[in-house]
Amino acid sequence: SSSSAASDVYKRQVYLDGEAFFDVKKDNGRTFQVVTELVEVKVLGTRFDVRVSEEDNMAEVVLESGSVKLNERNKAEDGVILRPGEMGRVSRQSGIEVRHVDLQLYTTWKDKYMNIESQKMENVMFMLSKRYHTEIRIEGEELKAEIFSGRFDIDQSLENIFETIDLITPIHYQQQPDGTYLVTPK
C-alpha cells in the first residue's frame, strides 16, 4: 500500500491516492480541497483523515474536528456535510454513506504511539491491520469480544506487538502463506 499526493499551493488543492491525515488552518477566502478519484472534500479549518482504496473502489473520510463537505467527484448534487466523529464512505455503487465511528479506530495510525483504551480485540486487530497494511483475521467470538487496553510504539514490528498482546491476553498468531495473519485464542 502506498500514498501519493500532488498539490497546487495557490489553489490549496491536493490530489490524493492512498491515505493522509490533514490538519487544515482557516484561510479566509481560500478553501482547502482534497481531490481523489471518487470524492472531493472541501474544507475551511479542520482535522480529518482521507483513505482511498482503488482495490475496493471506495474512499473514506473520517472527521476529527471542524466540518468538511463531501461531493462525489464530477457530480452536481449538493453533497454531504460531516460532523466530528462521522465517517463518509464514497463508492461508485452506493454513493455517499455517513455513519458515526469511534475516531480511535481510524486516526491512531498517524501518531508515534498507538494508544488503545478499552477496545474489543477485533477493533484492536482492525487498527493494527490499518497501521501495518495487512489483513489480520481473528477467530473465536470470546477473543473478538475481549476488552484490551495498551500502548504500542508503532515503530515495532507487528510480531512484537502480537507478543506484547499475548502477555496480557493469551493469543496465538500465525502468518499465512498469502502474507495475512490469523489470530486465535491460546
Place the predicted regions along the sequence by residue.
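Positively charged, low-complexity/disordered segments
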Residues: S2-A6
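A residue-level detector for the "anchor" residue at the start of short, highly conserved motifs
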Residues: S7-K186
